[in-house]
Each structure stands twice: as C-alpha cells, then as structure tokens.
Regions:
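Acidic, metal/ion-coordinating pockets
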Residues: 20-279, 305-316, 326, 360, ...
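Sec-dependent signal peptide recognition
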Residues: 2-10
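Catalytic centers of hydrolytic enzymes
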Residues: 24, 31, 37, 169-171, ...
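Intrinsically disordered, low-complexity peptide-like regions
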Residues: 4-5, 217, 275, 463
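C-terminal motif of bacterial Sec signal peptides marking the signal peptidase cleavage site
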Residues: 15-18
Length: 474
C-alpha cells in the first residue's frame, strides 16, 4: 500500500511538472530618433535578421522621428520615402509619431502614413481636418499566442500644446496631454493584453514622471525624443531609449510564464559590430548616388564643431539681410560637426534641413535681453531651458541666481537704448515667446541658400569654434 501511494505521488508530481506553464521569451527590438540616418540601416537589418534567426517571437518597434537630418532622405523625390521603404522591407511592426514627422506638414504626413506597411499608433493626436486621417491610439498584436498591446504618444510640451515645430504644421490638430492618454489606454488595455507596451515620444524626463506617478500597468516603455541612452526600472516598469541616429538597437527580452510576464531585461547593442546586409546596402547606396547632393560647394579650412556651426549660421543670417546682429537657435543646428575640407550640398542641407527663412526685427538690447531671459527660464519647453539656446554674433553673458534662473543679460559690445537690426530664423520669429520688436517681417532669404552662397564665394571658410556666449552665476 505504501509503495502504491509513493508511486501515485511520483506520478502526480510528474504530471504537475509537465502541466506547469513553461517559460517562453518575447523579444522587442526598438529604434528611436533615426533622423534619416540610413547609412547604418544595413547594419540594423543584419542585427534584426540575426535575432529573428535565433528567437521565435520578435517584434520590431520605432518610437518616432524617422526623418529630418539627412539630405539624401529629406530631399528625395518624395521626402522621407527612402527611410519608409527600408523600414517596410525590414518588416517593422509598429511605430508612433515624433515631432519631426510633422516637418513637411500634416497633409504630407497623412500621405506618408498610407505608405507605411506597419501600424502607426498615437493616442494623443485628434484631427479635425480631412488632410490628416485619425490614427488609432493603440494596436494589439498576437504573437505566439500572446496578446501584446502597444499604445503610442507624442510630446505636446514644447509647442506649447503641440509637438515642437512651426505652429502652422499643426492647424486643425489637437494634442491632449500624452501622460493622461497613456494612463487612459493603459486602464482600457491591461485586462485585454498579456503584455502592455508604451511607445513614447515624450522624452525620458516625461516618461519618468509618468512612471513615478504610478503607470505600473505598462510592462515596458520604449522611449524617444531626448536622444538619451536609457535602461532603468521604475515602479516595476522597464524604461528604455536607444540614443539617436541609428547608432544602437534596443533589445528588450520579456520572459513569459504562461500568459504572465515573469521578467524583463534590456540590452543596448551598438550596430557598429554588425556587417552590413548586402541587400539593404545596395538600396542605401542607390540613395546616396546623387551627383547634385554629392558635389562639393566649397570647403572649410578647419574642422567645425557644433558651436562653430552655430556661429557660422548666426553670422550667415545676419549677412544675408545686412543685419547688425544675428541669432541662431541651437536646436536648428542639426549636425554636431563638419570636418575640414570639401563641404557638399548634402552637408549643408543636413545642417539645416527645414527650409528655414530669415526673419528681420528692430530690437534694443532690452528687447534682446527679454528674449534671451524668457527662453532660458522657459517653464513650458523645459528641454530647451537653462542652456544657451540663442547663439549670436554679439557676445553676451547670462547672469543667473543660485537656482539657475536667468536674471539679466550683459552685452559688452552693445549700447543700451540703441535700436539694432536683428536677424533670426523664422522658427524663432514665429514660435518664441516674449519677442518685443518693431518692423518685424519674414524675408524671402533662405538659410541654406545663404550658407551655400558663402561656401561658393568665400571658400575656404575659417570657422570660429569659440563660444561667444556664457552663463555666470551671481
């Protein structure tokens, strides 16, 4: 009897072990803020294909800002299409919008979304226009018997009330608070999904706020916008971001036991170690075979860093309209450096990809001081606050208190009360707060045209990399 009982117990234990949920693995591969940097796309393709060869359940996700930053993509016959064609070929599954998706206007974006073979989700864009169709707030993918929910959100903090960019690009669109919408759809989807993912283009600072406030329904947040490398756990939710410009791929491993998440891990993998996929390399090479963009327009006599490029652009907008002072916002300087030697048209269009025009204003030093202080203390677009944002041809010092709030701006070379002709980008003219001026207008002079003309006529250019602006704590 005792032997029979022991046998029954052994058999029962074996059956229980056999029936216990076995652990399976789901892999989320992620990119963000690629900014049209397709040079590395063949390496991305190799990395994705290697993962698909070894893992059964793989989902490929992008967190926005797919174009603006590479002339070979941005100035293609259909701007942005080379990037979309590559993403379609690689088999992306889901993506959300970034602020730069709107750079060519909402009608253009609406047409581009129709060309995307992957789901585009965004829970906080509401359209009242026929040019931009409503987007689904989320999608649920079924992979290997698992239901995986993806909610998308985009920043509305820099506008304010809409993503960073010219306000005209967002006419007829409203952008509800992305954190509120992320919470709303988390509550709706969590009971219906085995895994819940937020694909966020809010920036890691806003993602951290959301998770610290208790958005624990999400298993993973795939982030973007701030160009950071992020791998952290907040309240049980994994927050990730891969940097920018397709330098890395994010690999999130989700271990499933039955239909429950047993654990999540993240690795940031550099693409530099992968040999380019030859099929994708051929497609990318065709994009770069553009004689017009490849032609050297002039040359730099020395290497230029980001500050030097900003100095050049500030001087160029002033020269272009014969202004006494030029300002250029650092966010509009889209390259970090240009080496000494020949400078191609593609480099100039990569430096300034927006088709920016020059605006003219009459301002006193008091007006300029107000503009600089307001931007430094910006309570809305905090990502651009508490830094030197407006690079200028005239030196100045921002004086701050101990809490880093701007109190004053000193102009050692300007005369108080005098009215100066000032040149800025049309983006600053249309979007910056607290601009006080007279005789303001947007001219027909475009920034890239001025830069190209200077290269053609004045090469070799010596670029001044010395900062003219600084901050001093009082």
């Amino acid at each position: 009897m005792e032997r029979i009982l022991r046998t029954v117990l052994i058999v029962t234990a074996a059956i229980a072990a056999a029936c216990a949920p076995r652990e399976r693995t789901l892999v989320l591969l992620s990119t963000n803020d690629m900014h049209a940097k397709i040079r590395n796309f063949p390496r991305l393709a190799a990395a994705v294909e290697a993962c698909r060869d070894t893992a059964q359940l793989v989902v490929l996700v992008d967190a926005g800002d797919r174009w603006t930053g590479n002339a070979y993509v941005d100035r293609a016959a259909t701007p942005g299409m080379p990037m979309i064609a590559l993403m379609n070929r690689l088999g992306y599954d889901v993506a959300t919008l970034g602020n730069h998706e709107f750079d060519h206007g909402q009608a253009f974006l609406g047409r581009m979304i129709d060309s995307m073979d992957f789901e585009v989700v965004c829970a906080n864009v509401v359209s009242d226009t026929c040019s931009f169709p409503p987007l689904p707030p989320y999608t649920v993918l079924e992979e290997g018997g698992f239901r995986i929910g993806f909610v998308g959100v985009v920043t509305n903090y820099e506008g304010p009330g809409h993503p960073a960019g010219n306000a005209s690009s967002f006419a007829g669109l409203t952008f509800p608070d992305p954190q509120r919408m992320a919470l709303k759809y988390a509550a709706e989807l969590r009971p219906k999904c085995d895994v819940l993912v937020l694909v966020s283009h809010m920036g890691d600072d806003r993602d951290r706020e959301l998770l610290a406030g208790g958005a624990s329904q999400y298993d993973v947040v795939i982030g973007g916008h701030t160009h950071e490398e992020v791998d952290t756990l907040i309240g049980g939710t994994l927050l990730t971001q891969t940097g920018k410009d397709l330098r890395n791929i994010g690999v999130t491993t989700i271990r499933m036991k039955g239909k429950k998440v047993a654990g999540v891990d993240f690795r940031l993998v550099s693409l530099a170690g992968y040999e380019p996929d030859p099929v994708f390399q051929k497609q990318v090479d065709a994009c770069y075979a553009n004689p017009e963009l490849n032609r050297p327009m002039g040359e730099f006599g020395n290497a230029a860093n980001k500050w030097g490029l900003a100095n050049w652009m500030a001087g160029a907008v002033a020269d272009g309209i014969d202004a006494e002072i030029g300002f250029y916002h650092i966010g509009g300087v889209r390259l970090d450096s240009i080496p000494a030697g020949g400078v191609s048209a593609a480099s100039v269009y990569g430096l300034e990809p927006f088709g920016t025009l020059v605006a003219e204003m009459k301002m006193t030093p008091a007006d300029m001081r107000r503009m600089i202080v307001s931007k430094y203390n910006d309570p809305v677009n905090v990502k651009e606050a508490h830094r030197i944002d407006l690079i200028s041809t005239t030196p100045y010092v921002i004086v701050t208190d101990q809490a880093d709030n701007a109190l004053d701006v000193e102009f050692p070379k300007l005369r108080e009360g005098k009215v100066y002709t000032v040149a800025v980008s049309d983006y600053v003219y249309k979007n910056y707060n607290d601009l006080n001026y007279t005789d303001g207008k947007i001219t027909e002079e475009d920034v890239t045209g001025i830069l190209l003309e200077e290269l053609e006529e004045d090469s070799p250019l010596r670029i001044d990399n010395t900062p003219r602006q600084r901050v001093r704590r009082k």
